[in-house]
Amino acid sequence: MTHNIHDNISQWMKSNEETPIVMSSRIRLARNLENHVHPLMYATENDGFRVINEVQDALPNFELMRLDQMDQQSKMKMVAKHLISPELIKQPAAAVLVNDDESLSVMINEEDHIRIQAMGTDTTLQALYNQASSIDDELDRSLDISYDEQLGYLTTCPTNIGTGMRASVMLHLPGLSIMKRMTRIAQTINRFGYTIRGIYGEGSQVYGHTYQVSNQLTLGKSELEIIETLTEVVNQIIHEEKQIRQKLDTYNQLETQDRVFRSLGILQNCRMITMEEASYRLSEVKLGIDLNYIELQNFKFNELMVAIQSPFLLDEEDDKSVKEKRADILREHIK
């Protein structure tokens, strides 16, 4: 069976050329409505559905997906595509609004009433902020958004009060991971109000040496200041990753090549493989491509990291396990 991984990928994720380190960027704005209790305090589901209806009416050009009308697998696919958070699934009255290419999504009734997301692979944080801000303006025209003149936007979590903005950049950092530098980097940037998390944010697991770098606090800084400082932090991490890769290539070339080609051999020949192992093998092959050790036709690290996740492997009506199907996809697309 041929597996068309493009069918499982949001349009914004598809790219002809992948960069060595930056995978994607995201801007998220948290907003709440006046005269409504916060989602975690709803007395009944109807409280949540009223908010869903109000937000949907304010954004008529977006497609509404109510989570109570979806099965668990469909919800998990949306998590894998970063359209919703794992936390949204836990809410009894939750929904998401998405645009055509799924680069913009509006989560309704997560921790806050509204969470606007703008995502892109080759788009600057400033451009993504402009897109998210445009949606925010559209909502503000018809909804009463909670705002305090001194504090800024009022949110459920105190760390989001102020701009209500979280800016984040997804980075592929195999060099720093292999050399065990990530703990030091995380401690350093934490002192400046920034954090490093797993692929799906707070509390999530790290897969394939992939990390999300984002701001922690939003109070007392403008959106532009947050974006500028995060960009500086990300650029410094990228600089260190490049230095480590150069050292691996110069002083540990044989060991690094052995690591790369072992992973390539496993991916091209495996018959069963877990998500965790597959992600790290893919990461090492990507490192080998970036260091010009190997050349593969149409190798798409970002797309494969989504396509091999369990929710996308449960559709096919056969008796194969998820591990077998994952191995089939990898052998088919890594040649």
From Swiss-Prot:
Coiled coil: none
Induction record: Up-regulated by heavy metals such as Cu(2+) and Cd(2+), but Zn(2+) and Co(2+) have no effect. Forms part of an operon with ctsR, mcsA and clpC, which is repressed by CtsR.
Gene disruption phenotype: Hypersensitivity to heavy metal stress, temperature stress, osmotic pressure stress and oxidative stress. Deletion of mcsB also results in sensitivity to variations in pH and lowered expression of the clpC operon under adverse extracellular conditions. Additionally, virulence traits such as hemolytic activity, proteolysis, biofilm formation, and evasion from peritoneal fluid killing are substantially reduced in cells lacking this gene. Interestingly, mutant cells also show a significant reduction in expression of virulence determinants hla and saeS.
Annotated keywords: ATP-binding, Kinase, Nucleotide-binding, Stress response, Transferase
GO MF term list: ATP binding; creatine kinase activity; kinase activity; protein kinase activity
Catalytic activity: L-arginyl-[protein] + ATP = N(omega)-phospho-L-arginyl-[protein] + ADP + H(+)
Residues given in the record as ATP binding sites: 24-28, 82, 115, 166-170, 197-202
GO biological process, one term: stress response to copper ion
A single cellular component GO annotation: extracellular space
Enzyme Commission (EC) number: 2.7.14.1
Domain Phosphagen kinase C-terminal intervals: 21-244
InterPro entries named among the record's database cross-references: Arg_Kinase (IPR023660), ATP-guanido_PTrfase (IPR000749), ATP-guanido_PTrfase_AS (IPR022415), ATP-guanido_PTrfase_cat (IPR022414), Gln_synth/guanido_kin_cat_dom (IPR014746)
One Pfam assignment: ATP-gua_Ptrans
Homology family: Belongs to the ATP:guanido phosphotransferase family.
Subunit: Interacts with McsA and CtsR.
HAMAP family reported in the protein's UniProt record: Prot_Arg_kinase
Role of this protein: Catalyzes the specific phosphorylation of arginine residues in proteins. Is required for stress tolerance and virulence in S.aureus. Acts as a modulator of the repressor activity of CtsR upon heavy metal and oxidative stress caused by these metal ions.
Protein name: Protein-arginine kinase
